[in-house]
Amino acid sequence: MKRRQTNLHTLLVALLLLSTPQAYAADASPSANCSTKCSSPYGEILGTTADGTSAYSNCKSDCVIFEPNQEQGVYSGIKWQCVEFARRWLMHNRGLTFGDVDTAADIWAIDSFTRLSDGSKVPVTNQLNGSNALPHTGDLLIYAKEYLGTGHAAVVLEVDRNKRLIRVGEENYQNKKWPANYARSIEFIARNGRYWLLDAYLLGWKKIP
């Protein structure tokens, strides 16, 4: 009976260790999990925004290495997921962060971000795709969970009304080199005072003050 209890205790300890990000990070490596059929090598810089925020390759969309990234001692997310880039860009450019989420689509349900300087709460709101106002620089485009089962998040970097384009920065979308200081451009149309971004699965945008 005592030996059975000891074995059970050992098993529980092992399970607890395996459930921690540190254990995943120690066992997981790009060479083991994310080295085949990559759009670009894991960890390679894909591009850098005009403000100096770099985006890194995640190899391919279904690659997940449970290795946390930190910026000046503050957690920015799991390398190199879309949520990590969105959070890191906000930290650099708005002095804001947001809580941990299971998937990118879950950002849609967050109603406040946190100011890094003093920990105060900053209200944020959602605007559905097809609303009466375009997103602004710094807003987050949020995609439904139907996209790859996780959704996606991208940062609005520029709104070009003349060309009717929204230029975004992001990680883990196509994992390809950026054409310039942005990852890609999204067309939009205007109909009856409402604006539609022509991108599949897009819920809308999180308005960032």
Regions found by a protein language model. Give the residues of each.
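Bacterial N-terminal signal peptides that target proteins for export
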Residues: 1-11
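...with weaker cross-activation on analogous glycine-rich loops/strands in unrelated enzymes
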Residues: 108-173
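Active-site signature of cysteine proteases
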Residues: 160-209
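Bacterial N-terminal signal peptides
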Residues: 10-19
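Sec/Tat signal peptide C-region and signal peptidase I cleavage site
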Residues: 21-25
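N-terminal capping segments
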Residues: 26-113
